[in-house]
UniProtKB/Swiss-Prot annotation:
This is S-(hydroxymethyl)glutathione dehydrogenase. It comes from Aspergillus oryzae (strain ATCC 42149 / RIB 40) (Yellow koji mold). Pfam families: ADH_N, ADH_zinc_N. The gene is FDH1. It comes from the Eukaryota. One of its GO terms (biological process) is formaldehyde catabolic process. Zn(2+) 2 binds at residues 103, 106, 109, 117. NAD(+) binds at residues 52, 205-210, 229, 298-300. The keyword Cytoplasm does not apply. CDD domains: alcohol_DH_class_III. Zn(2+) 1 binds at residues 51, 73-74, 180. Keywords: Metal-binding, NAD, Oxidoreductase, Zinc.
Amino acid sequence: MRHVLNKEQLLMVKQAAIAWAAAEPLSVENVEVAPPKAHEVRIKILHTGVCHTDAYTLSGKDPEGAFPVILGHEGAGIVESVGEGVTNVKVGDYVIALYTPECGECKFCRSGKTNLCGKIRATQGRGVMPDGTTRFKARGKDLLHFMGCSTFSEYTVVADISVVAVTPSCPTDRSCLLGCGITTGYGAATVTANITEGSNVAVFGAGCVGLSIVQGAVKKKAGKIIVVDINDGKEAWAYKFGATHFLNPARLRKTVQDELIDMTDGGCDYTFDCTGNVSVMRAALEACHKGWGESIVIGVAAAGQEITTRPFQLVTGRVWRGCAFGGVKGRSQLPGLVEDYLNGDLKIDEFITHRETLANINTAFEQMKQGDCIRCVVDMVVS
């Protein structure tokens, strides 16, 4: 029988990195973490990645960004306590937080056409739990949640549909990276695009997501895998993950789309944008083969940005589409990727270029701006 404690006994005071305002450094300080309510889970976060989406929101350019907030959405840890009605995880489970929940009941989940879930989208977008309140407080003020995860805290509270149990055999400094970047790219190639064998592929942007697409393209036995990046330092990384070619658009005498068309006998079968640059998105579409080429948009553009192309590009058979979390369903499919890693079929270790502690989390944001950083993992255990 589960021992039920009262709210005062369950209230925790722990360390977290708080974003009090846009474009300001995170402040590592004590926060109150309330107990989980019905259908909620409190997690002890052991490791978290730092993603460009966190930096985007912190910059103030995110139209849904609100402050004060605890950022972070790429985390793994151990279930510390559960609220009433939670059946999918239990205390002691090793878990990954999910910014794309999976309820299995809403029209999105039942459609079989998407990994998006609508059950808590409205409240998650406002930075609160499904009941409209928050579980964080500091300096006497409520703190907002971020993407339903808030992994920049020693302890966090998430909805039960926003967490998945995985094998404890996988270290959390690896499994955390499956909470966003690696899964987003790998899934874009293997699930959303479902690349066919022998296809020619171009990947725009060679960060964590782009390199994960390369990894997925290799898995699907693509033909030419062409990585496009303006940073020559990414060339070695591209080849490390299985690319067959590397292009720096700044060094070309023609447009990158024309170069890709020439390299692939009329255009790529699949292209992927991981940059968030709307001009690059257009180039990626126009590099697709007439009649069947697909371009998948993954990068998030700044607020107010719009994509454009000549309608004839679409009339003649090219397809523009997008995906979140690579089209992967978090609760039903993510554990399989953890097993793939443990079996040696999915690279994770190779993405980790930097490590930091919670106290130095702002350094991780600075490192992310450098061309040699693929992923920084933050150790969330405070001694």
